[in-house]
């Protein structure tokens, strides 16, 4: 039986308004075999232009993986280049992709948005 990698995906809220609307992520959690590709989607709050992806590994603080303002992507971490990427196919959507998952990728991944 192959080794499985568990990636928890949780909701991140940053700059939410009084209506309670927030970002949504899918899937909410993901279990993947080592070596498989994973894609996580984030839908931002309407009107927010900046989207952030964070990662929190067990026993560690959160780290910014990447953020984008409109279509401009900025890398803010020492994440393994080539395996992690984020795309912004629409103004309000970002997709974090992890290629060839490894044991060390097991973490909580969350997104947030701001004006």
Swiss-Prot record:
Secretion signal span: 1-21
GO CC terms, sorted: plasma membrane; T cell receptor complex
Pfam families documented for this protein: V-set
Domain Ig-like, first and last residues per copy: 22-115
Entry's localization field: Cell membrane
Cystines in this chain: 42-111
Database matches in SUPFAM superfamilies: Immunoglobulin (SSF48726)
Record keywords, A-Z: Adaptive immunity, Cell membrane, Disulfide bond, Immunity, Immunoglobulin domain, Membrane, Receptor, Signal, T cell receptor
Region annotation Disordered: where it falls in the sequence: 67-97
GO biological process: one example: adaptive immune response
Record text on subunit structure and interactions: Alpha-beta TR is a heterodimer composed of an alpha and beta chain; disulfide-linked. The alpha-beta TR is associated with the transmembrane signaling CD3 coreceptor proteins to form the TR-CD3 (TcR or TCR). The assembly of alpha-beta TR heterodimers with CD3 occurs in the endoplasmic reticulum where a single alpha-beta TR heterodimer associates with one CD3D-CD3E heterodimer, one CD3G-CD3E heterodimer and one CD247 homodimer forming a stable octameric structure. CD3D-CD3E and CD3G-CD3E heterodimers preferentially associate with TR alpha and TR beta chains, respectively.
Known function: V region of the variable domain of T cell receptor (TR) beta chain that participates in the antigen recognition. Alpha-beta T cell receptors are antigen specific receptors which are essential to the immune response and are present on the cell surface of T lymphocytes. Recognize peptide-major histocompatibility (MH) (pMH) complexes that are displayed by antigen presenting cells (APC), a prerequisite for efficient T cell adaptive immunity against pathogens.
PANTHER family referenced in this protein's UniProt entry, alphabetically: T CELL RECEPTOR BETA VARIABLE 7-4-RELATED, T-CELL RECEPTOR BETA CHAIN
Name under which the protein is recorded: T cell receptor beta variable 7-4
Lineage: Eukaryota, Metazoa, Chordata, Craniata, Vertebrata
Gene expressing this chain: TRBV7-4
